[in-house]
């Protein structure tokens, strides 16, 4: 329910998880995955074929809100029906993108070809941008493909990719308007205080040092 914008029940009601405006704007207009998100103009006509919400209900939806996840059988009011859904633990698309990235690290030409082949089923007019770093482009397409599925987190850590929620023009809420050079310090789980207090051998060995701070970008 927390990921389904249409769900009108429980704690998830009104949550409206959304995509970064920077990511949304980077998705090509011919990519069908862009239809998973509400545009800046909040056009109901654009999203109507893909939702069970009425135009009146849609009026409360914010720009860039996600419609990628839906309540089961389109049931937006009854949680006992709408919440019953399968959760894929692994998708074959991930394997294609892992192959493309791994190949690109040592053979850019073949890696580019693999990405091009993958994207042909998402945007037939897509071409790998010449100006973009190939690894960055592959990871971006992976971010869009698995948006909201929790897959990309470890890629961001592994490749030391930073956050840009504090950049000019952000649509992130005020408390989340933070930008980092490289991985964010809070992405590592630290030992809880109770564990450190009970086990003196952990003193000074937290992972990472939780005193690092990130300032909000105004």
Region roles according to the model:
Residues 1-218:
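Acidic/polar-rich alpha-helix caps and helix-coil junctions
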């Amino acid at each position: 329910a927390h990921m389904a914008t249409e769900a009108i029940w429980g704690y998830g009601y009104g949550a409206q998880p959304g995509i970064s405006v920077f990511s949304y704007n980077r998705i090509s207009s011919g990519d069908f995955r862009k239809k998973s998100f509400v545009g800046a103009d909040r056009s109901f006509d654009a999203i109507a074929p893909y939702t069970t919400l009425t135009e009146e209900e849609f009026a409360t939806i914010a720009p860039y809100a996600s419609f990628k996840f839906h309540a089961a059988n389109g049931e937006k009011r009854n949680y006992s029906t709408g919440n019953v859904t399968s959760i894929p633990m692994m998708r074959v698309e991930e394997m294609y993108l892992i192959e493309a990235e791994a190949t690109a690290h040592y053979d850019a030409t073949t890696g580019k070809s693999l990405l091009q082949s993958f994207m042909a089923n998402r945007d037939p007019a897509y071409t790998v941008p010449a100006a973009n770093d190939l690894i960055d482009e592959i990871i971006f397409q992976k971010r869009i493909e698995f948006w909201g599925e929790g897959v990309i987190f470890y890629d961001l850590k592994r490749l030391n990719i930073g956050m840009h929620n504090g950049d000019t023009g952000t649509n992130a809420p005020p408390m989340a308007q933070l930008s980092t050079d490289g991985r964010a310090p809070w992405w590592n789980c630290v030992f809880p205080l109770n564990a450190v207090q009970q086990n003196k051998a952990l003193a000074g060995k937290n992972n990472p040092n939780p005193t690092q701070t990130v300032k909000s970008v105004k």
